[in-house]
């Protein structure tokens, strides 16, 4: 995947596996290499930024890569039925969901007061699921004196991974058994490159 991203970021994308023969060969089934949970942002399509083709990636996209039951079910399906060996949780630079959650936190102090970072899957009390999850990541970052938007985006990826692992016994077991590796990443709109995150 990173080789494909290098091609994309250098303007040398090959657009593989997008021909008629590939499409017809996938009619009876799929065997993607990885599952990717990423933001719905129209500037961040995983298949394009990783220069992948039809059948290569099983993608789930939500605003701010937030997690709900449908997301967990989709990733569990990818593990159990499609046997993917890699899960990628990818945030990105200049994320609108992060900006929206930050604006909400700055406008309403009671949102901060509703949050405890003692639980890795704790959320803020808000009607907006984006504010509940992404806002919690922002406050977690701030509690560690990480105060830039870049920090918030990286911490949100880390908390999203923690949330997935804590809430899905299927994902837990697959990681423990060595069947799946889960990786955090962040796409840089300014360069077209994907950075792999370490936590």
Predicted feature residues:
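Conserved functional hotspot residues or short segments at active or partner-binding sites
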Residues: 89
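Short glycine-enriched loops at secondary-structure junctions
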Residues: 38-44, 63-66, 92-95
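Divalent-metal-activated hydrolytic enzyme cores
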Residues: 2-29, 54-55, 64-84, 96-199
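Catalytic core of membrane glycerolipid acyltransferases/transacylases, capturing the structured
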Residues: 43-60
């Amino acid at each position: 995947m990173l080789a494909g991203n290098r091609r994309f970021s250098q303007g040398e994308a090959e657009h593989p596996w997008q021909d008629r023969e590939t499409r017809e060969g996938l009619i009876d089934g799929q065997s993607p290499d990885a599952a990717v949970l990423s933001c719905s942002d129209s500037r961040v399509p995983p298949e394009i930024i990783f220069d992948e083709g039809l059948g290569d990636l099983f993608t789930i996209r939500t605003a701010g890569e937030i997690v709900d039951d449908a997301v967990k079910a989709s990733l569990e399906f990818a593990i159990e039925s499609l046997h993917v060996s890699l899960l990628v949780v990818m945030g990105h630079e200049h994320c609108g969901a992060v900006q929206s959650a930050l604006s909400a936190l700055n406008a309403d102090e009671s949102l901060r007061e509703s949050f405890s970072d003692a639980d890795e899957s704790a959320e803020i009390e808000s009607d907006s699921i984006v504010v509940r999850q992404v806002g919690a990541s922002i406050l977690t970052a701030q509690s560690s004196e990480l105060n830039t938007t870049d920090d918030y985006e990286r911490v949100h990826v880390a908390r999203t991974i923690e949330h997935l692992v804590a809430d899905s016994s299927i994902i837990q077991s697959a990681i423990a058994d060595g069947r799946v590796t889960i990786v955090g990443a962040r796409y840089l709109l300014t360069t077209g490159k994907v950075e792999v995150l370490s936590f």
